[in-house]
Amino acid sequence: MFLFLPIPLNVQDIWKVNSKYKHVLLTCPVCQNKTVRVYRLVKSLALIVLPVLPVYTSKVLRCSHCGWYEPVDSAMIDQRRRREDLPTPERPEASAQQHAFFPGSSSQQTDIPNVRPQPHIPPPRKSDEAPPPYSYK
């Protein structure tokens, strides 16, 4: 008598941080966070949940925040690292510090910090005032 038992096989993805690039953080083109790392993606044939045979291996850039990933090679990784390490030109209005003006102070004093405006807080009610009556119609 022949007994047919199905063998559950599937393809499993295994993500490993590439040890050569473990300190590299790049900017994600989708979410603009600096959370992209270089991973080694191994697709393997698995029996139930145990990986048995590796089928495919590649290097990928993967964002841990939004899940975006892109297959790359070593030359592309080095190119992106150089591009992100370039200094960005500063805007003149962003580099100039603006100080708050206080009446009666000298204009030559430059170590005055900016003061944030305080939110409007209404004065407290007197305890003898009753709250407004509610109307039921």
Swiss-Prot record:
Official protein name in the record? UPF0768 protein C1952.04c
Give the record's family classification.
Answer: Belongs to the UPF0768 family.
Regions of biased composition (Basic and acidic residues) lie at 79-93
Q: Where is the composition biased (Pro residues)?
A: 119-137
The signal sequence is none
Q: Using the UniProt annotation, give all residue ranges assigned to the region (Disordered).
A: 79-137
